[in-house]
Structure formats: C-alpha cells, structure tokens
Amino acid sequence: MSVCTGSALLAKAGLLDGLAATSNKMFFELARSQGDKVDWQESARWVDAGQYVTSSGVSAGTDMALAVIERVFDAELAEQVVNYTEYQWHRQADADPFAQLLNQGVTPS
C-alpha cells in the first residue's frame, strides 16, 4: 500500500509499470513524471491494482486501508474499524471530491 506521493517512489522503482495507480492531486504531475509506464488514474481516491494499492491523499489512505481490510478479511471487520475509530468511510474509490485540484500544485522542473 502506498499513501499520497508514495506512489511516485513505487513508480520510479518500476514497481507500478503496467498497473493503474493514483497519487496526491497537488503533486500528480510530479508522480506521473516518475513512471511513464503507469496507468495514472486522475480521479480516484485510491486504486486497487492487486499487489499494489495506491491512494491520492492522506485521508484517502484511510479509505484505502479500510477497503483492503474489507478485501482481505471481510466487511464486518472493516466496519468495526470504522466504528472504533469514529471515521466516516468514503467507500467509492472513483468518487474523489478533490479531483478538481489536479495539477494545481507542484510540477516537475
């Protein structure tokens, strides 16, 4: 699992080649510049590509972690974590309210 701009490091290492991934919208072009063989998803809170799961921002990382718990274990356990942490889970990976921030931050020089 990778949170925020960690996907840029995975991309630079070639670990995301041929896979879908996402990154923080404010640093998206920076991440994209690290992996031209990555299928970058601009409007995703997180992307589950099987072996690698990437999230856009830090709070999206919590949503991603809950989705992984649900996939690996079950929905009941994920809901328990939600309740214990008093967190409002955004379950839809493709419903990113921050997509409009795409490319408004740091770009590679």
Go through each PLM region and give its residues.
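Active-site-adjacent pocket-lining segments in enzyme domains
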Residues: 1-109
